[in-house]
């Protein structure tokens, strides 16, 4: 799931890397339309991947229980991140599983709030990878 997916570049890259069920969340109507156009043009070249864009406020989006990778490219501030993390936590408590958070810009590390069960796995330049485990 790519939060703040914009034009959909990350969705297409994820498909190229072998991800199958790929979702972008975007609030801007014009970016949603651009993203739909881009993934529509790409889809015939990779029919194995299911690419979807959803026009929704990230704070209101409830991730499906099959989601395992969450991607953030500096889309928003601490208050929104906090609420999105609550939604992700709810999803992994509903169906316990380990998930990964890819954070470009290392914003998540710079906020002064803790996410229970969230472990920094590594950082390369401005990319941070976290592992998030269910609490039970």
Regions found by a protein language model. Give the residues of each.
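C-terminal substrate-binding/active-site "lid" region of AdoMet-derived donor-dependent transferases
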Residues: 79-134
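Conserved S-adenosyl-L-methionine
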Residues: 16-21
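A short SAM/SAH-binding and catalytic strip from SAM-dependent methyltransferases
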Residues: 67-80
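Conserved beta-strand/loop positions that form the S-adenosyl-L-methionine
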Residues: 3
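Short beta-strand "acidic-cap" motif of Rossmann-like dinucleotide-binding folds
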Residues: 24
């Amino acid at each position: 799931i790519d939060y703040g997916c914009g034009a959909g570049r990350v969705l297409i890259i994820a498909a190229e890397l072998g991800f199958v069920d790929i979702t972008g969340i975007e609030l801007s109507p014009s970016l949603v339309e651009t993203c739909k156009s881009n993934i529509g043009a790409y889809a015939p070249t990779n029919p194995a991947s299911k690419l979807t864009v959803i026009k929704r406020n990230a704070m209101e989006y409830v991730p499906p229980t099959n989601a395992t990778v969450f991607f953030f490219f500096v889309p928003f501030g601490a208050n929104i991140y906090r609420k999105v993390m609550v939604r992700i936590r709810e999803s992994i408590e509903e169906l316990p599983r380990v998930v990964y958070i890819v954070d470009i810009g290392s914003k998540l590390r710079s906020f002064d709030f803790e996410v229970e069960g969230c472990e920094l796995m590594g950082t390369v330049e401005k990319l941070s990878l976290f592992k998030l485990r269910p609490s039970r």
